[in-house]
């Protein structure tokens, strides 16, 4: 479901395009708060400290992936606006391969550098580090999903669809909270 944002009233088109992205950001904040509450209620202060200590690293990795996906999205939107279907397909294919390879590389480096990460993040408590290491291992296993969501979302937004990424995010948030409670 794509929408030609070059037709019709500009303000209306921009608002209709932006509202799902704003709602998506609010939804992400809600499930981050839910994660924090669930961890603190069920796993205790050390687990909460482990998750909190991981935040800087996870923000960095996610920002790198998101930046690459958004840059690709700019190229996609240019190709889409030019009505260059072949160029759009080629851009999508090339950027997917590049970002997927970088995602794998970042993941491998993160796994290999876990002890260095501990020093960099200055986590001195062994109990917190043990929980943090376990948490990061799970997160690193899911980084491919983060890449796929961000990549597909940027592609869809580039062709005018900001609703589908919101739906994907809503389903993901509900699954995340449900799995948090289950495990």
Predicted regions and their residues:
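Residue-level recognition of transmembrane alpha-helices
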Residues: 18, 25, 52-55, 99, ...
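Interfacial/gating helices of multi-pass transporter permease domains
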Residues: 39-59, 127-131
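Alpha-helical transmembrane segments of multi-pass membrane transporters
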Residues: 110, 163-183
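Residue-level signal for short hydrophobic patches within transmembrane helices
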Residues: 7, 11-30, 34, 57, ...
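Helix-loop interface residues and adjacent transmembrane-helix termini in multi-pass membrane transporters
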Residues: 18, 30-33, 42-45, 79-82, ...
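Small-residue-rich hydrophobic transmembrane alpha-helices
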Residues: 48-108, 146-165
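Short alpha-helical transmembrane segments in multi-pass integral membrane proteins
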Residues: 1-18, 76-142, 178
């Amino acid at each position: 479901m794509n929408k030609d944002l070059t037709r019709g009233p500009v303000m209306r088109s921009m608002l209709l395009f932006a509202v799902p992205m704003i709602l998506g950001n609010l939804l992400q904040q809600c499930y981050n708060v839910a994660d924090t509450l669930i961890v603190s209620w069920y796993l205790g202060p050390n687990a909460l400290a482990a998750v909190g200590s991981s935040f800087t690293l996870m923000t960095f990795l996610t920002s790198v992936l998101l930046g690459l996906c958004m840059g690709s999205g700019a190229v996609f939107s240019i190709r889409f606006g030019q009505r260059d279907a072949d160029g759009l397909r080629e851009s999508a294919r090339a950027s997917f391969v590049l970002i997927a390879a970088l995602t794998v590389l970042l993941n491998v480096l993160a796994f290999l550098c876990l002890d260095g990460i501990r020093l960099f993040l200055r986590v001195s408590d062994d109990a917190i580090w043990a929980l943090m290491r376990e948490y990061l291992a799970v997160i690193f296993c899911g980084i491919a999903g983060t890449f796929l969501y961000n990549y597909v979302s940027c592609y869809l937004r580039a062709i005018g669809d900001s609703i589908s990424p919101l739906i994907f995010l809503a389903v993901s948030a509900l699954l995340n909270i449900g799995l948090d409670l289950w495990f």
